[in-house]
Amino acid sequence: MHFLSTSTHSHINEIKIMTYELSPGLTQVLAFCRKAMQEKALSDISTDCLLLGLLHDERSQAMQMLQSLSCPIEELKQQIMARLDSLQKSPLPSSEALVLSMESRRLLRLTLLEARRYGEEMANELHLLLAILHDSN
């Protein structure tokens, strides 16, 4: 899977193409993020988009983990949607690649580190959830 990373400015200053080893579930999360980015006319995929992508599939390991911890999933989804709706709209990138914010790019790197930490060759949704949780502290 290829990703475009941008600077924190509204226009693309720097483009780097990276390849990550991702599970099918994590690939689906990122596909959902791309769709959400396009629907909401966002300039890039933010951490909020990544978290919303994790919350999209109720059968995912990340969702099962959050549900077992009695996390208020629907309330969390509504808060994230409200934050995304409040963001300034931008022209959509012409590429089919994912355009990641610097923060999201860093989170995906942390996701890979989480996978390696647990001896996994492929990063999955749980690794992304762990990366988000570790990063929020």
Language-model region placement:
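Histone-fold recognition with a strong bias for associated Lys/Arg-rich disordered tails
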Residues: 2-137
